[in-house]
C-alpha cells in the first residue's frame, strides 16, 4: 500500500503544535528528524530534545489528498505552513530495511559490535551482540566509537568500571567482555536501564556483574575506570562528583563533547587528572586521563 508522506521544516518551539495538528488530521505516525546533520544540544528540563532545524515527517494512509490536508493544517494552527514537501511513497518492509542498515562494526583490535540477527564476522574476536533500541549507543555515533576504541586499547583485567549515563549499556558491556571484573551502570532514563539489562542478557552477562541504578540510587563506589558519554554541560557541572568516583590511579574517558567544547570540559578535570591529548573525530572529541 502506498503512503502520503509530508515533510515540514520547523523549529523546536513549533514541534508540539504541529505534532498535535498532524495527529488530529489523521497522521498514522509523526517523526522528528535532524534537518542539517546537527548535534542535539542540552534541552531545557521537561522538554523534548530537538535540533535547531528540525524536519517533522508525517505519514498518511494511501489515497489521502495532500492539498486539502495542508489547508486543514493551516486552519488548525492559524498560520501559513512552514517550508514543506509532500510525496507518495511505496510501502516497504521497514523493519527489514532498518535491519539491513545496521551492520557489524569493528573498534580497535579486538572488539566488534554485531547486530544480534547477524553472524559475527570474526567468531574468535570479542563480539558484543546488540539490538538498537530506545536508548542511545549502537557504535555508529563518533562519540560512542571513540569510547569503544579507547576501551579496546585498555587492560581492563580485574577492573571495576562505572558507566555514567549508560544508555544502551554498550560501553559497560564492552568493558566486561574485554576483561573487566564488574561494571556498574547508571542513567536518568528507566528505559535506558531496561535496554542495558536486555543487552547484557543478550551477551550472557549475569545481573550481579552489571548492577544498574538511577543516579539517586547509585551507591558510593570508587571505580578503576569511569566512562561517561553524555553531554558537555553535565560533564562540566558534574566534574567534582565524577572525579570523586574514580580511584587514585584510575582512568577516565569522557565524550559526547563537541570539538569547540573540549577545552572547557578538559579544564574542569585538569586539577584531578593527568589528561591525554584530546582525540577528535567528525567534530566530536574524547577526553581521557588518569586520576592523581
Swiss-Prot record:
Gene: prmA
Source organism: Pseudomonas fluorescens (strain Pf0-1)
GO biological process, alphabetically ordered: methylation
HAMAP family, per the entry: Methyltr_PrmA (MF_00735)
Keyword terms, alphabetized: Cytoplasm, Methyltransferase, S-adenosyl-L-methionine, Transferase
Gene3D superfamilies per record: Vaccinia Virus protein VP39
Annotated GO MF terms: protein-lysine N-methyltransferase activity
Membership in a protein family: Belongs to the methyltransferase superfamily. PrmA family.
Transmembrane segments: none
Location(s) in or outside the cell: Cytoplasm
Protein function: Methylates ribosomal protein L11.
Record-given protein name: Ribosomal protein L11 methyltransferase
Keyword hit for S-adenosyl-L-methionine: yes
Binding site for S-adenosyl-L-methionine: 144, 165, 187, 229
Xref: InterPro entries: Ribosomal_L11_MeTrfase_PrmA, Ribosomal_PrmA_MeTrfase, SAM-dependent_MTases_sf
One Pfam family it belongs to: PrmA
Enzyme class: transferase
Main location group: cytoplasm
GO terms under cellular component: cytosol
